[in-house]
Structures are given as structure tokens and as C-alpha cells.
């Protein structure tokens, strides 16, 4: 069954262009111009990925991103204006998986969409839990089959990008990882002109969810996980 993409865009020409392009790529595509329309679509059918313009007529797209992430692991790619750098960073902090800027480069966009959907499919195909699939560190358990993180049996919700970054650290414990290397490990961001600040945003988000002293900054070099892993 084709993946279902929802395009949330209030500019008619851009909306029609995206709908036509992704339909030709073989996806099932729904379109709406508002946050209310998105919620209605999600209530009536499964959604795999959302292309979300942050400037909507009825509500702030960044706040909508946070609301979506609180109750769903659906893929979210923000569509922002070229000058909205702060909004892009805030959007990632709110839980978006990725972002693109206008004017849209459709070939780059489809690569980002395909990579994110690939990661979503991997998570859905995860095998049942076994201890051998778990990395343990500082009281945490990162299960690489189920793509879950727990501490003392309590789940900690991670976005796909946060999960991928944490995997990079637990598989290289104590090793200093540069921002460039970490960015290459995030599959949805293997595109030209990557933004290294994406790494800093994800580090801040992980520090908020984990013990803050676990991810250590080595100034001028990168970050490392300050914990034994078994």
C-alpha cells in the first residue's frame, strides 16, 4: 500500500504543485490549508508523513508540531521561508523530523521524504524485544529492535532523529563525534548543504530527556557519551 502523505499548505499554487508531484511519485496524497483540516484527515485515516507549512491561517505551525508530537510519532517535515532560521531551529526542538525551505527544490524534498519514510518503515518492522537488542548505559535501556528508550521500566519518547543520534553515541561510547560525523549518521539529512546546527538542536533535546551530564561537549571537536555501555 502506498504511503499516505498529507500536505498542509495554504498557498494554492504550492499546494497543487506538491500534490501533483508526490502523486506522480506514487504516494497517496491528501491536502489541506489548515491545522483543523489536518486533524480531520488524521481522525479518519492513517497518515505516514506530514509536510507542514509553519505559516498557517488558523494556527501556528510550530505549536501544531508540538501538539502532534505529544500524541503521535508521525513523520513531520516543516516547510519554512528562507529567512525563518529561528523558526527552523524551534521546529526541530518541538519535535519535527526535518525541514525544507522555500522556494522548494522538489528533488531534494523527495529525497528527504523517502529517507524519512524508510526510517518509519524500519521502526514498524522492528522485531519483538530481546535483551540482546538493548544497549544499557547509566540506568537507561535503548532497544534497537523496537526503537525505544526506557529508564527503570518507564518509556522515554524519542523522535526518529533523536533515536538515530543516541544510537550513534551508544555504539561509539567515549568517542568524540564531530558535528559533521553526527549529521552524516542522520539518514534523513544526507543531502547537500547540511545545517550543522541541527546536531546542536538534537543534543539539547536529548539532554532534556536524559541526564544532562551524559552528553559532554568537547569544545572545538564535538560531543561524546560519558557512560559505560553494555
UniProtKB/Swiss-Prot annotation:
Subcellular location: Cytoplasm
Record protein name field: TorCAD operon transcriptional regulatory protein TorR
Protein function: Member of the two-component regulatory system TorS/TorR involved in the anaerobic utilization of trimethylamine-N-oxide (TMAO). Phosphorylated TorR activates the transcription of the torCAD operon by binding to four decameric boxes located in the torCAD promoter. Box1, 2 and 4 contain the DNA sequence 5'-CTGTTCATAT-3' and box3 contains the DNA sequence 5'-CCGTTCATCC-3'. Phosphorylated as well as unphosphorylated TorR negatively regulates its own expression by binding to box1 and 2.
UniProt cross-references to InterPro entries, sorted A to Z: CheY-like_superfamily (IPR011006), OmpR/PhoB-type_DNA-bd (IPR001867), Sig_transdc_resp-reg_receiver (IPR001789), WalR-like (IPR039420), WH-like_DNA-bd_sf (IPR036388)
Span of domain Response regulatory: 4-117
NCBIfam families given in the database record: PRK10766.1
Biological-process GO terms, alphabetical: regulation of DNA-templated transcription
Main location group: cytoplasm
Gene that encodes the chain: torR
Modified residues (4-aspartylphosphate): 53
Gene Ontology MF: a single term: transcription cis-regulatory region binding
One Gene Ontology cellular component annotation held by this UniProt entry: protein-DNA complex
Keywords associated with the record: Activator, Cytoplasm, DNA-binding, Phosphoprotein, Transcription, Transcription regulation, Two-component regulatory system
Amino acid at each position: 500500500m502506498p504511503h499516505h502523505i498529507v500536505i498542509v499548505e495554504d498557498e494554492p499554487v504550492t499546494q497543487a504543485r506538491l500534490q501533483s508531484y508526490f502523486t506522480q511519485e506514487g504516494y497517496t496524497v491528501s491536502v489541506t490549508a489548515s491545522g483543523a483540516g489536518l486533524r480531520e484527515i488524521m481522525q479518519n485515516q492513517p497518515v505516514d508523513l506530514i509536510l507542514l507549512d509553519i505559516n498557517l491561517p488558523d494556527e501556528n505551525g510550530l505549536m501544531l508540531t508540538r501538539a502532534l508530537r505529544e500524541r503521535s510519532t508521525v513523520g513531520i517535515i516543516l516547510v519554512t521561508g528562507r529567512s525563518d532560521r529561528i523558526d527552523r531551529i524551534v521546529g526541530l526542538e518541538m519535535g519535527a523530523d526535518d525541514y525544507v525551505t522555500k522556494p522548494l527544490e522538489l528533488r531534494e524534498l523527495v529525497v528527504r521524504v523517502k529517507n524519512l519514510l524508510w526510517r518509519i518503515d524500519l521502526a514498524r518492522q522492528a522485531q519483538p524485544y530481546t535483551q540482546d537488542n538493548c544497549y544499557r548505559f547509566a540506568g537507561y535501556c535503548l532497544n534497537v529492535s523496537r526503537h525505544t528508550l526506557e529508564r527503570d521500566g518507564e518509556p522515554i519518547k524519542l523522535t526518529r532523529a533523536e533515536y538515530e543520534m543516541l544510537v550513534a553515541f551508544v555504539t561509539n561510547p567515549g568517542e568524540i563525534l564531530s558535528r559533521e560525523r553526527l549529521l552524516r549518521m542522520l539518514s534523513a539529512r544526507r543531502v547537500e548543504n547540511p545545517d550543522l546546527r541541527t546536531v546542536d538542536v538534537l543534543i539539547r533535546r536529548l539532554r532534556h530527556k536524559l541526564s544532562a551530564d551524559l552528553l559532554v561537549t568537547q569544545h572545538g571537536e564535538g560531543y561524546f557519551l560519558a557512560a559505560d555501555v553494555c
